[in-house]
Amino acid sequence: MNRLIIIFFILFAKLSFAQKEIDWSVLADVEFTDLYIEEVDEYFLYPHFGPSVRELAGKEVIIRGFVLAIDPTQNYYILSKGPFSSCFFCGVGGPETIVELEMKSSKEVFIMDEVATIKGILKLNSDDIYQCNYILQDAVVYLRE
């Protein structure tokens, strides 16, 4: 009986700390307002994250998308809902359709539009205009397709 209880608690602990697989519809739980940033004399879209996104902040998530190799020499990659030809940077979709990748290993190399599933800690960014609104920290490749 004691053995059964121990096994139950181990399984419960594993499930409670497990990563959550999400899709892009979850990240769409955000609204934007124009915010003037004096430092750069421009208006930016300021995010107001919805409850389902705020619930994921600081948690490990898994998401599949197209890797955009923005600057591979600097290990700077973006995960996008769509390929480069139809991504946020080309005027299709909003900022909620991209996630900045802070890779755990600088040895990861991707090619443009490579489809990959990435695992990392989701950070919500509303203050730094030089980074994306969604950032995956300690990101690792979960699956390459």
Region spans (language model):
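OB-fold and OB-like single-stranded nucleic-acid-recognition modules
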Residues: A18-E145
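Sec-dependent N-terminal signal peptides
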Residues: L4-K14
